Every structure is written in C-alpha cells, then in structure tokens.
From Swiss-Prot:
Keywords: Ribonucleoprotein, Ribosomal protein, RNA-binding, rRNA-binding
Protein name: Small ribosomal subunit protein uS8
Key word Transcription regulation present: no
Protein family: Belongs to the universal ribosomal protein uS8 family.
Lineage, broadest ranks: Bacteria, Bacillati, Cyanobacteriota, Cyanophyceae, Synechococcales
Signal sequence, renumbered to the chain: none
Species this protein is from: Synechocystis sp. (strain ATCC 27184 / PCC 6803 / Kazusa)
Assembly and binders: Part of the 30S ribosomal subunit. Contacts proteins S5 and S12.
UniProt gene name: rpsH
SUPFAM superfamilies associated with the record: Ribosomal protein S8
Amino acid sequence: MASTDTISDMLTRIRNACAVRHSTTQVPTTKMTLSIAKVLKSEGFIEDYSETGEGINKMLVLTLKYKGKTRQPLINTLQRVSKPGLRVYSPSKKIPRVLGGIGIAIVSTSHGIMTDREARRQGIGGEILCYIW
C-alpha cells in the first residue's frame, strides 16, 4: 500500500522492528528516506543500509543496531515532529537540543538532510523532521 508520508512510514517500520528485535527492516526507497538512512548510519543508530530491487519496487534495507547480550535497541524513541498537516520550521539559533544533546533532531535544510548539530554549526535553519534518542 502506498504511503503519503514516507518519513512517518519509515520511522514506524524502524520502531516496530526494534520492538520485536528484528535484525533488518525494509522501507520504500525515496531520496528523503535514503538521506535519513545516511544520517542514522553516520550517527551510529543503524549498522548499515543497502538498496534492493529495481524501479518502483526499490526498497531500502536497514540493518538495525542493538547493544548487549539482551539486544536492547540503540533507538529508544523515534518521534515525528513536522507532519504533512503541520509543518515545523526553525531558524538555526532556535533548533532544539534533544535530551540536552544526547539525542538528535533530523533537519531538512536547503543544504540537504542533516542533524541539528550540523545545522547549528553551519548556521542553517530548516524543517524539523523528527527526534531520535
């Protein structure tokens, strides 16, 4: 089934896969989901990602990361902030810190998708997509 909000769909699939301790999960590939996967990998929330399939059936396979013998997920919370019905924008000086810097906010800027720290460092504001910790 086609989803109109691919970011929420991606976050929900990751949240559900972490809840049942799956090692991988698949999400439909878009430029946005690919950029978010790059940020998640660079911040250490997922091990890796790869693309499978061709054309309209292209999927992004995310390899999730767990800690310890009990396999506790590294991602505790995924919270969507800006939604299709209510967009949330923030200038660079007012981008919120997530849990005092422990978590990250993923921001869509004119220079691409990046973390809140990168956006503040570059002095760029944008749309706050989600919080992850």
